């Protein structure tokens, strides 16, 4: 291809092609508006307290604040991470059986029903605990300790806190991001606790103290059901080790 313009014009042309190419590879190239609406098809049901809150634009704006989210690895890895993120957060915000189609009730809630603690669960990941609000706020540039309800009133902030939690290792827990893209290697302690790579250990990261190491239970099955549905929509295999039934939770070492 020949180019007869000035060097500056050539630079601008190349930069534009680089920029548009980069954007095309962003998370929006996989999670289109139509796919988002089909995945979370009942989120705006009139019976849902979150009706009208979780928008596609808010999700994309939040995701773009975390460049590695849904953009790391090959196409399969990216799709698998997106399925896993929405699988876990759909369970956290589920409204149950809103239609005859199973695992379509995600993103029905913004706030935890029990609001006795100031830092009760809010948003897609149901962010709880003052320490998490402080860390998330620092990471995304928002004062959440004194204004925790921003997580329930600003959809972009709400998604940002969920993605922050997803991308961030804490204490002896790896990040969910590292687990699902295959970057996590279990330590000796993890191996002794039966914590192995797969979707199941992400459940352990998020709510292992309640759901893991106690045998089969409906909560874990619900998380798996959402994940399988999204994997099907994204045309990716869910992989192995989907539950945490035999895993010791991270709080037990």
UniProtKB/Swiss-Prot annotation:
The active site is at 92 (proton donor). Induction: By TMV infection. GO terms for molecular function: chitinase activity; endochitinase activity. Disulfide bonds join 212-244. It is found in: Secreted. The keyword S-adenosyl-L-methionine does not apply. It catalyses: Random endo-hydrolysis of N-acetyl-beta-D-glucosaminide (1->4)-beta-linkages in chitin and chitodextrins. Changing residue 54 to F: In strain: cv. Samsun. GO terms for biological process: cell wall macromolecule catabolic process; chitin catabolic process; defense response to fungus; polysaccharide catabolic process. Belongs to the glycosyl hydrolase 19 family. Chitinase class I subfamily. Defense against chitin-containing fungal pathogens. PANTHER family: BASIC ENDOCHITINASE B, CHITINASE-RELATED. This is Acidic endochitinase Q. It comes from Nicotiana tabacum.
């Amino acid at each position: 291809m020949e180019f007869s313009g000035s060097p500056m014009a050539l630079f601008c042309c190349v930069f534009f092609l680089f920029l548009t190419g980069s954007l095309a590879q962003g998370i929006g190239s996989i999670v289109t508006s139509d796919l988002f609406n089909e995945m979370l098809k009942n989120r705006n049901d009139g019976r849902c307290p979150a009706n009208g809150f979780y928008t596609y634009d808010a999700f994309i704006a939040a995701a773009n604040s975390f460049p590695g989210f849904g953009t790391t690895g090959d196409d399969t890895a990216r799709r698998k991470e997106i399925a896993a993120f929405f699988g876990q957060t759909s369970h956290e915000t589920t409204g149950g059986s809103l239609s005859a189609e199973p695992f379509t009730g995600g993103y029905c809630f913004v706030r935890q029903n029990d609001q006795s603690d100031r830092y009760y669960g809010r948003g897609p990941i149901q962010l709880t605990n003052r320490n998490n609000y402080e860390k998330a706020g620092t990471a995304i540039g928002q004062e959440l300790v004194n204004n925790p309800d921003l997580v329930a009133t600003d959809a972009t902030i709400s998604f940002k806190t969920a993605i922050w939690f997803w991308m961030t290792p804490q204490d002896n827990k790896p990040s969910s991001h590292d687990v699902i893209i295959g970057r996590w290697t279990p330590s000796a302690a993890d191996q002794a606790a039966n914590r192995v790579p797969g979707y199941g250990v992400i459940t352990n990261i998020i709510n292992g103290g309640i759901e893991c190491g106690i045998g089969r239970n409906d909560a874990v099955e619900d998380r798996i059901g959402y994940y399988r549905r999204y994997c099907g929509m994204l045309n990716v295999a869910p992989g192995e080790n989907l539950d945490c039934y035999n895993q010791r939770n991270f709080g037990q070492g």
